């Protein structure tokens, strides 16, 4: 059949500069979750192809490209990095995976981390993650199933490991030393903003 003759290269996006085709992406450039990793997702979600492409505007050339073949529920871009957010599960089993890439010319993948809950926010998901002084700060929400207190909110701080492809948890609120919940009982978060070393909810 026609599908049997289709190769992975046939499915890749095409790019053109001044109406001329450019060979800028190989299937070997595409990254996927390592299913054997302890922090890997357990479901398939809604797989999509997300491309990172470095374009030299002055020279009108494509310097590099990376292909990411997993669900992408949100994107956050800092001055030095770009983060893809991948959410899984629901209720008290919900979690979010955060995948980090450098924004230099090689677009290198540098690591992934996991936090409890989702970065939900009625269209404001990307405001719930922030990079500051080498730390990644994330606000997540999680449904509890309790009608009297239906939501738990968390602030998690991650940091790039110096010797592995991991975004490691540095701290989280609430915790055993600071157990107070982040909001009033049964209260939803409608806005999240990071400014320097302060967080406004």
What are these regions (language model features)?
Residues 1-201:
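Beta-sheet-rich non-transmembrane sensory/scaffold domains
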């Amino acid at each position: 059949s026609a599908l049997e003759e289709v190769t992975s290269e046939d499915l890749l996006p095409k790019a053109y500069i001044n109406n001329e085709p450019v060979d800028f992406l190989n299937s070997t450039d595409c990254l996927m979750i390592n299913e054997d990793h302890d922090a890997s997702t357990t479901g398939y979600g809604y797989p999509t192809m997300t491309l990172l492409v470095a374009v030299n505007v002055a020279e009108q050339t494509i310097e590099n490209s990376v292909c990411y073949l997993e669900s992408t529920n949100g994107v956050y871009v800092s001055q030095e990095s770009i983060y893809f957010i991948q959410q899984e599960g629901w209720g008290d089993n919900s979690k979010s995976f955060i995948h980090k890439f450098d924004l230099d010319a090689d677009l290198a993948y540098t690591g992934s981390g996991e936090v409890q809950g989702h970065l939900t926010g009625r269209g404001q998901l990307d405001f719930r993650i922030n990079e500051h002084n080498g730390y990644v700060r994330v606000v997540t929400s999680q449904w509890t199933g309790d009608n009297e207190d239906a939501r738990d909110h968390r602030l998690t701080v991650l940091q790039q490991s110096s010797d592995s492809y991991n975004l490691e948890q540095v701290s989280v609120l609430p915790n055993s030393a600071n157990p107070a919940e982040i909001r009033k009982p049964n209260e939803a978060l409608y806005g999240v903003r990071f400014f320097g070393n302060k967080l406004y909810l």
